[in-house]
């Protein structure tokens, strides 16, 4: 709707024109005009990890800058007639974005958002516009609920192939998708991650004990079958959350293999232990997958993990992912994490002030993690708005952002093994 402050700036409509023509002309303005920011260079910034098992060792900043300068010179020489020239690296871009499933878009839940910005037609076109403008080689998307009916074909028209996993609950319609450019990478293999498997592991570990404790009704049925008691771990852990991981062979010049994982952990802050259990299961699966790829292809794959972790910097999940210790403030022996990780934003420019922006909650929930190695480094990151930026004032979604989350992204350079 037009406010009283903007109406007097509009040209006076021609009252002789048919009403339908006027309506058509006024509707040409989209409800959402996406605001997409640029990537900024972080070359020369060293990243590290408490675990150096992948062969990563920090080098002095001045040496990093010399390496970056050499790479820039090398890249500029591609295509020259010098046959002795050796290509030093190849770059690709990864973006993670919780696009807000349309099934969760209700005016009652988002009263701060302009109604026109919540309509599927406006949002879907705006999301596609954002993705197109970001020009990533990989997209890790969460809350994808129209994969077959909308995203698969539309992303295909933009030059992307996709893999997808839907949430496991019967009434859950959204899931996680990884879209990638076949011109950049070849899909080698993939695996699903279903966090409800945690329930099965508990059942397997305690089946004999459970058989003794479970009371049955007069009909002989399991009285816990329909239980909603969150004190019951079989109920507490069944949150229908999922993830997906895949190995990609980066095309020319030296076909390095990169593992890309995308996930969406449970949201409820009251179930922090559930989110931590999911994070631990995630890293254990990633470690197994990485070993599988290493053995099968006799290589050292790089690993990138992205998604909506529903965890703020410094909480148990975040601390576990970057240090292996869920409670860093306590003087306890660290638990060895299966995969060493560093947050790309944290080790370059610091975590964003927020990636989720609503009246009830504004903070950082989305991350891109990297397992540090000699073979891959971040060279740029996607800029994010400040809290007082005009395009986020009034919270999200709005006329500039089709989701309540912001996209995050990074560009990486792979060097020859």
UniProtKB/Swiss-Prot annotation:
<dbReference type="Pfam" id="PF03372">
    <property type="entry name" value="Exo_endo_phos"/>
</dbReference>
<comment type="subunit">
    <text>Component of the CCR4-NOT complex, at least composed of CRR4 and CAF1 proteins. Forms homooligomers.</text>
</comment>
<keyword id="KW-0479">Metal-binding</keyword>
<feature type="binding site">
    <location>
        <position position="143"/>
    </location>
    <ligand>
        <name>Mg(2+)</name>
    </ligand>
</feature>
<dbReference type="GO" id="GO:0004532">
    <property type="term" value="F:RNA exonuclease activity"/>
</dbReference>
<dbReference type="InterPro" id="IPR036691">
    <property type="entry name" value="Endo/exonu/phosph_ase_sf"/>
</dbReference>
<keyword id="KW-0378">Hydrolase</keyword>
<comment type="similarity">
    <text>Belongs to the CCR4/nocturin family.</text>
</comment>
<dbReference type="GO" id="GO:0009507">
    <property type="term" value="C:chloroplast"/>
</dbReference>
<keyword id="KW-0007">Acetylation</keyword>
<dbReference type="GO" id="GO:0005737">
    <property type="term" value="C:cytoplasm"/>
</dbReference>
<keyword id="KW-0694">RNA-binding</keyword>
<keyword id="KW-0090">Biological rhythms</keyword>
<dbReference type="GO" id="GO:0004535">
    <property type="term" value="F:poly(A)-specific ribonuclease activity"/>
</dbReference>
<dbReference type="GO" id="GO:0046872">
    <property type="term" value="F:metal ion binding"/>
</dbReference>
<comment type="function">
    <text>Acts as a catalytic component of the CCR4-NOT core complex, which in the nucleus seems to be a general transcription factor, and in the cytoplasm the major mRNA deadenylase involved in mRNA turnover. Transcriptional regulator of circadian rhythms with poly(A)-degrading activity that affects the expression and rhythmicity of the clock core oscillator genes TOC1 and CCA1. Deadenylation may be a mechanism involved in the regulation of the circadian clock. May play a negative role in response against oxidative stress.</text>
</comment>
<keyword id="KW-0963">Cytoplasm</keyword>
<dbReference type="InterPro" id="IPR005135">
    <property type="entry name" value="Endo/exonuclease/phosphatase"/>
</dbReference>
<dbReference type="InterPro" id="IPR050410">
    <property type="entry name" value="CCR4/nocturin_mRNA_transcr"/>
</dbReference>
<keyword id="KW-0539">Nucleus</keyword>
<keyword id="KW-0540">Nuclease</keyword>
<dbReference type="GO" id="GO:0005634">
    <property type="term" value="C:nucleus"/>
</dbReference>
<dbReference type="GO" id="GO:0000289">
    <property type="term" value="P:nuclear-transcribed mRNA poly(A) tail shortening"/>
</dbReference>
<keyword id="KW-0677">Repeat</keyword>
<dbReference type="GO" id="GO:0003723">
    <property type="term" value="F:RNA binding"/>
</dbReference>
<dbReference type="GO" id="GO:0042752">
    <property type="term" value="P:regulation of circadian rhythm"/>
</dbReference>
<keyword id="KW-0460">Magnesium</keyword>
<keyword id="KW-0804">Transcription</keyword>
<dbReference type="GO" id="GO:0048511">
    <property type="term" value="P:rhythmic process"/>
</dbReference>
<keyword id="KW-0805">Transcription regulation</keyword>
<protein>
    <recommendedName>
        <fullName>Carbon catabolite repressor protein 4 homolog 4</fullName>
        <ecNumber>3.1.13.4</ecNumber>
    </recommendedName>
</protein>
<keyword id="KW-0269">Exonuclease</keyword>
């Amino acid at each position: 709707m037009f406010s009283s402050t903007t109406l007097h700036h509009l040209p006076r409509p021609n009252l002789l024109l048919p009403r339908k023509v006027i309506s058509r002309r006024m509707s040409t303005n989209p409800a959402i005009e996406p605001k997409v920011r640029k990537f900024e260079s972080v070359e020369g910034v060293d990243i590290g990890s408490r675990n150096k098992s992948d062969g990563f060792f920090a080098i002095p900043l001045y040496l990093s800058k010399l390496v970056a300068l050499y790479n820039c010179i090398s890249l500029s020489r591609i295509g020259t007639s010098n046959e002795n020239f050796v290509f030093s690296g190849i770059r690709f871009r990864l973006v993670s974005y919780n696009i807000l499933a349309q099934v969760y878009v209700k005016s009652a839940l988002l009263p701060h958002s302009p109604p026109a910005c919540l309509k599927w037609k406006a949002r879907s076109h705006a999301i596609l516009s954002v993705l197109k403008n970001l020009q990533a080689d990989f997209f890790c998307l969460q809350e994808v609920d129209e994969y077959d009916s909308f995203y698969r074909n539309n992303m295909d028209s933009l030059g992307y192939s996709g893999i997808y996993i839907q949430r496991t609950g019967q009434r859950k319609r959204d899931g996680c998708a990884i879209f990638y450019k076949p011109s950049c990478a070849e899909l080698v293999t993939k695996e699903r991650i279903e966090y409800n498997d945690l329930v099965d592991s508990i059942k397997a570990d305690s089946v004999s004990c459970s058989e003794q404790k479970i009371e049955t009704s007069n009909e002989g049925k399991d009285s816990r079958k329909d239980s909603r008691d969150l004190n019951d771990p079989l109920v507490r852990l069944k949150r229908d959350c999922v993830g997906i991981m895949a190995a990609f062979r980066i095309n020319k010049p030296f076909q390095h293999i990169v593992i890309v994982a995308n996930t969406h952990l449970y949201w409820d802050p009251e179930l922090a232990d559930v989110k931590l259990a999911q994070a631990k299961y995630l890293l254990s699966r990633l470690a197994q997958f990485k070993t599988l790829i290493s053995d099968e292809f006799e290589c050292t794959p790089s690993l990138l993990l992205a998604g909506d972790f529903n965890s703020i910097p410094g909480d148990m999940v975040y601390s576990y992912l970057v240090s292996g210790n869920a409670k860093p403030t306590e003087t306890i022996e660290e638990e060895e994490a299966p995969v060493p990780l560093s947050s790309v934003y944290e080790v370059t420019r610091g975590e964003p002030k927020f990636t989720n922006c609503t009246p009830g909650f504004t903070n950082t929930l989305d991350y891109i993690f990297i397992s540090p190695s000699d073979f891959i480094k971040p060279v740029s990151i996607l800029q994010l708005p400040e809290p007082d930026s005009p395009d986020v004032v009034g919270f999200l979604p709005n006329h500039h952002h089709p989701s309540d989350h912001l996209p995050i992204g990074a560009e990486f350079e792979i060097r020859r093994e």
